[in-house]
């Protein structure tokens, strides 16, 4: 929504002053898959670990390697990898588990000091979460939430198309008696339609102050912390 917390606060203040709706277009927030994941959490027992991953090789990276620096890799534009795609992982973790009590991070940078990939460890009272992101590599691993009785696997954190529940041996699910289940979710071609529907609903109902603003602020504070304190590796 903004490149730092102060910008975000200014935008929120301006929106309220002018009685207009401000909403970050965070795709996972409004996808029905998110509620399905949230509702499945009790089935895997006490949550101990979550690992959300979004590593996508940028189509512009090859041009960067040829010496052509486009906006996607220009550090002056405030679009570091953590802000561009790491935000999907961090925001989803904040939505599900709240703000962490401690944050640790490490990032890699390109020759022009552009932050291109990294990992953010988020410490909670009873669990640890990690956000893994990159604009210069690709990953095929799912994002995972691990509980004492099983795990939830999400194929793409930014736009889920399959959500799988796996329970450990000896912890058969009381709902269907099994230990593996593909949750009944039917993805659409473009899940941006859900954020548009929610935005229209907020506008129609004069929803100037809404819960999503706080999620955006909590997320950008974490990103600010990462960019201010990360250890850069070239």
Predicted regions and their residues:
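Contiguous beta-strand/loop segments that form the cofactor/metal-binding neighborhood of enzyme cores
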Residues: 89-161, 196-207
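C-terminal helix-rich "cap/oligomerization" subdomain common to oxidoreductases
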Residues: 198-234
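Active-site loop of classical SDR/Rossmann-like NAD(P)-dependent oxidoreductases
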Residues: 183-197
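A general structural signal for well-ordered alpha-helical segments in protein cores
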Residues: 8, 34, 89-90, 162, ...
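Short polybasic amphipathic segments
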Residues: 143, 160-175
